[in-house]
Amino acid sequence: MTQILSCEWAIFLKSSGYIIYITKLIGGLMELNKIATVKTGLVLSRKESKDASERFEYRQLNLKAVCDNGTININDTIPFYASEQLTASYLTQVGDIVVKTSEPYTAVYITEEYANLVIPSHFVVVRVDITKALPQYIAWYLNKDRIKKAFSMSCAGMLKQIKPTMVGATEIKLPSLKRQKQVAELYEISNQEIKLLEKLIEQKKKYYKALISNVNRIK
């Protein structure tokens, strides 16, 4: 495990060693809808308030807020004013997986940080039976390039939008829960390092931009 964790960056970039290791952890196939409920999000117009004096305020998930690396930028979520208090089924819950219905079909595992966001209809919501599978593992699996390519090839029209039935019919390679946990932990470690590196890149960009501006002002 130490050797694997010492090269998390290479892991995330799909080095051959990582793919081989993950492949060894995988078991038999099972359709997602056998181990999870899969449905579309809320049609917002059905619950949107038309009365400014009588409404319930929420934060709403949107396509812009979902990053390609499977995270959510909370700052990009937007307000949603409902005509009534929404039931939990319309909101993100810890352990949920939300999948963009449009390319690149990014799947996001919902942590405490991403909970209680309104899920609109351009997302598919996957709620996994945790006695059969780990949601973190399923999120990793749905983000595989092969799965995304299959979604794209199965869609008709310019928008290439997927439906809950298509997501539910996805065949998942399902090893033991112990093996799933190993995969999920590796995936989480790689994502954490990626986020740190991306933050460092942004800081470096700002630093050099300021440095160049200062040099340019010197006479």
Residue positions per predicted region:
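Non-catalytic DNA-recognition/assembly elements of restriction-modification systems
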Residues: 12-56, 174-219
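Glycine- and charge-enriched low-complexity intrinsically disordered segments
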Residues: 135-148, 152-156
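A short beta-sheet element
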Residues: 101-140
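Short, surface-exposed loop/turn microsegments at beta-strand edges and helix-strand junctions
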Residues: 50-58, 78, 90-92, 110-122
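Sequence-specific dsDNA recognition surfaces
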Residues: 33-49, 64-94
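Generic structural signal for buried aliphatic residues
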Residues: 96-99
